[in-house]
C-alpha cells in the first residue's frame, strides 16, 4: 500500500504509531526486527528511527552515478539477515518519491531471496509512504515508472519488464497538515508552489522574506535567537560546500585539518602508483564516492557537523545525527549532538570503496561532515523551526522548491538568500498519483 500526503501531514507520526503497535503486539527480542523502517537517505532514515534501505537490505549501490546490477548475498550474509528478519511483520519505506524503480525491483528481489518465495516483496506486508510530487530519485526513474527493457536485461538479467508499482500498490492519503497548522497563509503559499502555480500573492510573500545581510550575519542572528541553529538549504553540492567553508572560517576558534589514511586490500600505501594517486585526487571533493569519508576533514571547536554512519543506534549515534564540536583530539572528536544530553566521543572508522574495477581502497577517517548547509535532496522529511533557503533559478528538478519551503514549520521561520522572478517559469511538478 502507498500512503501519500503533502509535507507536514504527520506521515512520520503514522510510521511511529505502526511500529509501536507492532512492538506492543509481538514484543520483538533484542536485535530482532519485526517492523523494518527504511528510507533512501541517512537523514530521512534517522528522522523516522530507521535505516537506509541499502544498509538494511544490502542492496546494490551507485558507483560513479550508476547503480550496479543485482547480486545475491553470500551464504553468510544471507544467514545473518534471515536471523534478523525471521519474524518480520511489515516493511515501511518512507520518502518513496526518492526511491527509483530499479531499487524497488532490487528490494523485491532481495526479499524473494531472504524469504525463499517468488511472491511480491517476499510475501511481507509492505507500506510505502511519501509524496510523489516531492523529490524524484537523484539517478533513475520514479517508482511508478516501468523499468526500461535495457535496464531489465543489464541490471536484473531477465527478459521482460514489469511495472511493480502498478502491479502491487494500492493508494490512500493523509489530508490534515499538522506542520503548518494555524498558519493558513503559509499553507496556501506552499500549495501553490507544490502545484507549480505561483500566484502574485505568493511571489510577493517570498520576496518579502529575502534578507539583505551576508549569510554569515544572518546565520549568527538566527543562531542567537533559537535553541538549535538554522539549516541552510541549497540545490547543489558545490553551493553547500562553499557555505560550509564560509561558516567554518567565520568561527574564532582554530581551524584543524584532519587527513584520511588510504590503504589497499593488503594494508599498504606503497603500491599506489601515479595513476591510482591521480584517481584518488579526483575524488577529493566527492565523499559520496569514498564511502562517505572525507579526504581532508576541516573542523574547529564550535562548528556544526553531521555523523555519516551508524556508531550506536541504541543511543542515537546514527547516520544523520547533527551536533556541535566541543573538542578535537588526536584519536577522538567530542560532539554535543542536538538530541543527546551529554557529549559523545567519535573515533575514526574504516570503510571500503571501489576506486576501479580491480582496486578497492580502505579509508580511515572520522565519519563527519560540516553541517551548516545541506542539499535539499538530503533533508527531505525533516521539520525545521528555522531555515535559510536559496530560491534562485539554480533550484532544479521537480518538487525541489516545494520540498525546501515545506520543511519549515512557519512563515516566520523562512529566510531566503535569494528569489529569482524566473523561478515561476522553472518550477514544475509531477502530476501523476496525486489522488
State the predicted function of each range.
Residues 1-435:
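Conserved ATP-binding/catalytic motifs of P-loop helicase motor domains
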Amino acid at each position: 500500500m502507498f500512503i501519500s500526503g503533502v509535507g507536514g501531514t504527520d506521515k512520520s507520526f503514522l510510521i511511529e504509531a505502526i511500529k509501536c503497535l507492532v512492538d506492543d503486539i509481538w514484543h520483538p527480542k533484542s536485535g530482532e526486527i519485526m517492523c523494518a523502517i527504511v528510507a533512501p537517505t541517512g537523514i530521512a532514515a534517522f528522522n523516522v528511527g530507521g535505516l537506509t534501505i541499502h544498509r538494511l537490505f544490502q542492496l546494490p549501490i551507485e558507483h560513479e552515478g550508476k547503480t550496479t546490477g543485482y547480486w545475491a548475498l553470500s551464504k553468510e550474509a544471507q544467514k545473518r539477515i534471515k536471523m534478523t528478519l525471521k519474524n518480520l511483520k511489515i516493511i515501511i519505506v518512507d520518502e518513496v518519491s526518492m526511491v527509483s524503480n530499479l531499487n524497488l525491483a532490487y528490494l523485491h528481489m532481495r526479499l524473494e531471496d531472504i524469504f525463499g518465495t517468488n511472491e511480491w516483496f517476499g510475501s511481507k506486508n509492505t507500506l510505502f509512504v511519501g509524496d510523489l510530487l516531492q523529490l524524484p530519485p537523484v539517478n533513475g526513474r520514479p517508482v511508478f515508472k516501468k523499468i526500461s527493457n535495457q535496464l531489465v536485461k543489464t541490471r536484473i538479467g531477465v527478459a521482460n519488464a514489469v511495472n511493480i508499482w502498478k502491479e502491487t500498490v494500492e493508494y490512500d492519503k493523509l489530508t490534515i497538515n499538522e506542520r503548518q497548522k494555524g498558519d493558513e497563509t503559509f499553507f496556501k503559499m506552499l500549495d501553490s508552489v507544490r502545484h507549480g502555480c505561483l500566484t502574485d500573492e505568493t511571489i510577493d510573500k517570498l520576496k518579502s522574506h529575502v534578507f539583505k545581510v551576508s549569510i554569515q550575519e544572518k546565520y549568527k542572528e538566527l543562531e542567537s535567537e533559537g535553541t538549535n541553529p538554522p539549516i541552510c538549504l541549497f540545490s547543489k553540492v558545490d553551493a553547500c560546500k562553499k557555505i560550509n567553508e564560509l561558516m567554518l572560517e567565520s568561527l574564532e576558534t582554530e581551524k584543524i585539518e584532519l587527513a584520511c589514511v588510504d590503504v589497499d586490500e593488503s594494508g599498504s600505501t606503497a603500491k599506489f602508483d601515479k595513476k591510482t594517486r591521480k584517481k584518488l585526487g579526483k575524488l577529493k571533493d566527492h565523499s559520496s564516492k569514498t564511502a562517505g569519508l572525507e579526504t581532508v576533514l576541516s573542523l574547529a571547536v564550535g562548528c556544526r557537523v553531521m555523523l555519516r554512519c551508524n556508531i550506536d543506534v541504541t543511543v542515537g549515534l546514527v547516520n544523520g545525527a547533527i551536533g556541535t564540536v566541543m573538542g578535537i583530539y588526536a584519536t577522538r572528536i567530542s560532539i554535543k549532538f542536538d538530541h543527546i544530553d551529554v557529549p559523545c566521543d567519535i573515533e575514526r572508522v574504516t570503510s571500503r570503496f571501489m576506486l576501479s574495477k580491480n582496486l578497492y581502497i580502505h579509508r580511515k577517517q572520522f565519519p563527519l561532515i560540516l553541517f551548516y548547509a545541506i542539499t535539499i535532496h538530503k533533508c527531505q522529511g525533516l521539520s525545521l523551526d528555522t531555515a535559510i533557503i536559496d530560491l534562485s533559478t539554480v533550484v532544479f528538478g521537480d518538487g525541489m522548491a516545494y520540498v525546501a519551503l515545506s520543511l519549515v514549520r512557519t512563515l516566520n521561520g523562512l529566510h531566503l538568500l535569494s528569489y529569482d522572478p524566473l523561478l515561476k517559469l522553472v518550477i514544475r511538478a509531477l502530476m501523476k498519483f496525486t489522488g
